[in-house]
């Protein structure tokens, strides 16, 4: 009870200051939130423009293809290794 009476007495002594402070605090945080939202938006645009993600995807595709090739032709029927193709074409020419 003492705390409530104390805060009421402070509010009643300076009512203009409390209203001004709450408005100033509200404005301060609104600016902070707006600035943060703008910063997040700019960061998102920067990341989208970055080539790093494209490079990662390209390297992942290359590694996946290399792994499939190393596993052998029996495990990857959709792609014939380049060395096998060249051998078959030479055989056809010789025959």
Swiss-Prot record:
Bilayer-crossing regions: none
Region ranges (Disordered): 68-95
Basic and acidic residues: compositionally biased ranges: 76-95
Entry-linked InterPro entries: FAM240
Top-level taxonomic group: Eukaryota
Family of the protein in this entry: Belongs to the FAM240 family.
Annotated protein name in UniProt: Protein FAM240C
Gene that encodes it: FAM240C
């Amino acid at each position: 009870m003492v705390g409530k009476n104390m805060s009421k007495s402070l509010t009643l002594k300076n009512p203009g200051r409390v209203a001004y402070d709450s408005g100033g605090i509200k404005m301060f945080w609104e600016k902070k939130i707006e600035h943060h939202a703008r910063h997040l938006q700019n960061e998102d645009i920067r990341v989208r423009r970055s080539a790093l993600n494209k490079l990662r995807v390209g390297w992942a595709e290359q590694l996946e293809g290399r792994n499939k090739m190393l596993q052998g032709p029996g495990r990857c029927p959709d792609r014939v290794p380049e060395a096998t193709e060249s051998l078959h074409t030479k055989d056809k020419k010789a025959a």
